[in-house]
From Swiss-Prot:
Pfam families: ApbA, ApbA_C. This is 2-dehydropantoate 2-reductase. It catalyses: (R)-pantoate + NAD(+) = 2-dehydropantoate + NADH + H(+); (R)-pantoate + NADP(+) = 2-dehydropantoate + NADPH + H(+). Its main location: cytoplasm. One of its GO terms (biological process) is pantothenate biosynthetic process. The keyword Acetylation does not apply. GO terms for cellular component: cytoplasm.
Length: 300
């Protein structure tokens, strides 16, 4: 399968590297110095697996369309990425494996055929051309917002053959919301206190607060017509257990002096609450506190 990874950061490079290693025709689209390092020495994957993969990388979007575009940018870069790839997005299958709510809607606005996706795999860029696979997780994909499609079954088969455990859902929008709700509770609390995820699980005050954030997100989702395949509270406890030793991605962004994705997680939950005349005070508070922390960190 001819696959372009649009946004060759940590997760994008991990998926692209594993797919290329399995013999798929992969092109990583990203930024220097990461792209240059991959073209010079190959893509090195360390951690869960140790691989050195020969894979093509570029900073420019090609003219030719692939079979599948995997969108793996940060959510705040979605529009910029889709604009740069407008000529290949239109009429093409585009799979989002991003955090947050609303990325798939943007794909549709640009004329793409949207496949929703979530992944619990963990990865980080250790150095240009080097990706650390920090946690082996599960990927769930499906026709957005709901439904069946034979091509998506084929994508899942390709991913599974590349050691990316993948399942297909006919209700992918519910998984996107469920993951966003879990992230809305764990990420801001872990970021504000600068602690590993296990601290939230082990501290009664933090755990009860995080659980209230999950409940609030569920109320907003249900009022917006989302029907969950799996209760987000179950996913919340499962995530805390599986990522006990992790510093969450929002905190890692803050430490690197980068913008976080809070606007597309807590911010979106607040936005959807307003749309159905609900209030989401805990999400509103966490959203504001993270935006404040972003601004303060930026001034250091």
């Amino acid at each position: 399968m001819k696959i372009y990874i649009l946004g060759a950061g940590a997760i994008g490079s991990l998926f692209g590297g594993l797919l290329a290693n399995a013999g798929e025709d992969v092109l990583l689209i990203g930024r220097d110095p990461h792209v240059s390092a991959i073209n010079e020495k190959g893509l090195k994957i360390v951690g869960i697996k140790d691989l050195n993969v020969k894979v093509e990388a570029t900073t420019r979007v090609p003219e030719e369309k692939p079979d599948l575009i995997v969108l793996a940018t940060k959510s705040y870069s979605t529009i910029e990425a889709l604009k740069s790839a407008r000529h290949i997005v239109k009429g093409s299958w585009v799979l989002s494996i991003q955090n947050g709510i609303g990325n798939e809607d943007k794909i549709i606005e640009f004329g793409g055929k949207a496949i929703g996706g979530i992944t619990t795999n963990g990865a980080m860029v250790e150095a240009p051309g080097v990706i650390k696979w920090t946690g082996k997780g599960v990927t769930i994909i499906g026709l957005y917002p709901q439904g069946k499609e034979k091509f998506i079954e084929k994508v899942a088969d390709v991913f599974n053959s590349a050691d990316i455990e993948t399942h297909v859902s006919e209700n992918i929008i519910s998984w996107i919301w469920a993951k966003a709700i879990v992230n809305s509770a764990i990420n801001p609390i872990g970021t504000l206190l600068e602690v590993k995820n296990k601290v939230i699980r082990e501290n009664d005050f933090l755990l009860s607060m995080a659980m209230e954030v999950v409940k609030e997100g569920c109320r907003v989702a249900l009022q917006n017509g989302i029907e969950f395949d799996v209760p987000p509270m179950d996913l919340f406890f499962q995530t805390l257990e599986q990522t006990r030793e992790n510093y969450n991605s929002m905190l890692q962004d803050i430490w690197r002096g980068k913008k976080t994705e809070v606007d597309y997680i807590n911010g979106k939950i607040v936005e959807y609450a307003k749309a159905v005349n609900l209030e989401a005070p805990m999400n509103l508070l966490l959203w504001g506190l993270i935006k404040g922390k972003e601004a303060l960190e930026g001034k250091k």
